[in-house]
């Protein structure tokens, strides 16, 4: 099994739509760290699990310096973002989304 990991640093803002009163319902920003883990039994014809540049272009290209509420079709919680990122990247099996020090959400395909 081959494993690769891509770490992305993204600046972006969001506002959460919550069923309770929270300061997170106000527009605010984070310096996000999104870690994408991919795996494959075989390598593609170029000798890779997936191209790191493709991950960066697909994820950072859309999210970096964006208001996530404007570009994502769901409530942009860290958990929802983790799942969305995993769905966007070929051979992805896990994503960790850190919105601030100590606050990390993960999505993993078992």
Annotate each PLM feature.
Residues 1-110:
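Charge-rich, low-complexity N-terminal segments
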């Amino acid at each position: 099994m081959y494993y690769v990991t891509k770490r992305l640093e993204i600046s972006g803002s969001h506002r959460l739509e919550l069923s309770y009163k929270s300061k997170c319902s106000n527009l605010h920003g984070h310096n996000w760290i999104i870690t994408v883990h991919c795996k494959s039994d075989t390598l593609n014809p170029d000798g890779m699990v997936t191209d790191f540049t493709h991950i960066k272009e697909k994820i950072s290209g859309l999210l970096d310096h964006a208001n996530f509420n404007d570009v994502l079709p769901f409530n942009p919680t860290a958990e929802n973002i983790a799942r969305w990122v995993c769905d966007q990247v070929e051979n992805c099996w896990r994503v960790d989304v850190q919105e601030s020090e100590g606050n990390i959400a993960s999505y993993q395909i078992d």
